[in-house]
């Protein structure tokens, strides 16, 4: 569970988060493949502990083309409320609750050209462990997975399962858009696991702790 102080931050209106980012943080974007401008109908993955200022740093042109798969847990409600302020659509569901509806919604979103975003180690971990869901979805639609991270130069870590990060004032927030990974079609269980590990490693390569 997220601590109460972080939960309250999730309820700040978007303009407050934007002002906090503009005043207290320096922002950088690393997007060597120009995916913010061009990516459509892709699956994206970002670790759970990077979510606090992620929507404020993510450019608007990318946000409006993104649908996020968000846990049906109480923590997921905080995330859903936060991203809705920024124009990101949320689909609630997980492997234990509402998973079928979330998968159906994600399928429709990809078909409509939206990017579908996952926090693949949420909502309960283990930390930095990729779930199979993004791999299964990308394989079923023969689409790419794009690793995305937001790295703070200085931050506090909360004592939660994922060591949730709160960037310190006047630190630098760097949005890193990784190299797209082409997922083969119709993977079997062994193939899903093989590519799960490949995507996990690719996301870790752009994750700075």
Question: For the regions a protein language model found, what residue spans apply to each?
Answer:
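Membrane-anchoring hydrophobic helices of lipid-metabolizing enzymes
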Residues: 1-57, 81, 198-209
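Catalytic core of membrane glycerolipid acyltransferases/transacylases, capturing the structured
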Residues: 40-97, 141
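Acidic, metal-coordinating catalytic cores used for nucleic-acid/nucleotide bond scission
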Residues: 74, 96-99, 123-130
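Short, hinge-like loop/turn segments at secondary-structure boundaries
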Residues: 85-87, 109-110, 162-169
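Generic beta-sheet signal
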Residues: 93, 119, 147-150
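Catalytic-site beta-strand/loop segments enriched in glycine and acidic/polar residues
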Residues: 105-137, 141
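A cross-family acyltransferase "interaction/gating" segment
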Residues: 129-188
